[in-house]
Swiss-Prot record:
SUPFAM superfamilies tied to this protein: Homing endonucleases
GO biological-process terms attached to the record: intron homing
EC number, as in UniProt: 3.1.-.-
Gene behind the chain: aI3
Keyword line: Endonuclease, Hydrolase, Intron homing, Mitochondrion, Nuclease
Short name of one Pfam family: LAGLIDADG_1
Domain of life: Eukaryota
Full protein name: Probable intron-encoded endonuclease aI3
Top-tier EC class: hydrolase
Length: 243
């Protein structure tokens, strides 16, 4: 299967970053001693060279800084991309005006951040912080086929949430899961003409898993043309060699 790889330019990285943020990131509003509000965009991934280099590309294209953390459980070290300066956050979130967030959770986080940036009121924040997912604002309806940046977005999202599984039985598979986002998984299912049913693996955690070879080949074609940029690309490279 020969497909020419796309050049990863700044705009492609922005689109990829939106998907990556939706899968493994967070849009945060916090407080310091109930006196001042603090704002933060963050993506945490396993600490490895591939993820570090991906974050360097994101840093160059978008901004932010990178640091390394040891998890509290000491299960693994993490590499973290962070933006925590208010003016830089205000600049970066304008990217979402062009490449909108697709998951309801991140849309709610962004709306809460914007409201607090405007209000700058610690008391309001303390009162409303537990309600940011309860008070639902009207989210735009969309069809993936109408989203011009979806291909790069999906690669970013899969970098965070996708899994390429190689089995000795030769029943290899690709899966992706997300909490609450059944509608989004349904759109991905439709985009690739997947016939497999979406399963609820745990409470409010939905799973889409694909075994069918013709669909897996279609997915492989996608990730060659719109490449994964971090550690997930290693598992993809091993996976595609079986087809």
């Amino acid at each position: 299967m020969k497909v020419e790889k796309r050049k990863i330019d700044t705009e492609s990285i922005k689109k990829f970053w939106v998907g990556l943020l939706e899968g493994s990131g967070s849009i945060q509003v916090n407080h310091w001693k109930k006196k001042n509000l603090q704002f933060r965009l963050e993506i945490k991934l396993k600490n490895c060279n591939e993820n570090f280099l991906m974050f360097k590309d994101i840093q160059k294209a978008i901004g932010g800084y990178i640091r390394f953390e040891t998890s509290k459980k000491k299960e693994r070290d993490q590499v973290v991309w962070i933006v925590d300066q208010k003016t830089e956050i205000e600049r970066i979130i304008k990217i979402f005006d062009q490449y909108a967030l697709l998951t309801k959770q991140k849309q709610d986080q962004l709306n809460f951040l914007k409201e607090n940036l405007q209000r700058q009121d610690v008391n309001w924040y303390l009162k409303e912080r537990d309600n940011k997912y309860k008070v639902r604002v009207a989210h735009p309806d969309y069809k993936i086929k109408d989203i011009t940046y979806f291909n790069e977005w999906l690669s970013g999202f899969v970098e965070a949430e996708g899994c390429f599984c190689i089995r000795t039985s030769t029943y290899h598979s690709f899966s992706i899961s997300q909490k609450y986002e059944k509608v989004l998984l349904s759109q991905i299912k439709e985009f690739f003409n997947i016939t497999t049913q979406i399963k609820e693996s745990k409470k409010n955690i939905f799973l889409l898993e694909v075994y069918k070879k013709v669909i897996l080949q279609k997915l492989i074609h996608h990730f060659i043309e719109y490449p994964l940029l971090g550690e997930k690309n290693k598992s993809f490279e091993r996976f595609k060699n079986f087809f």
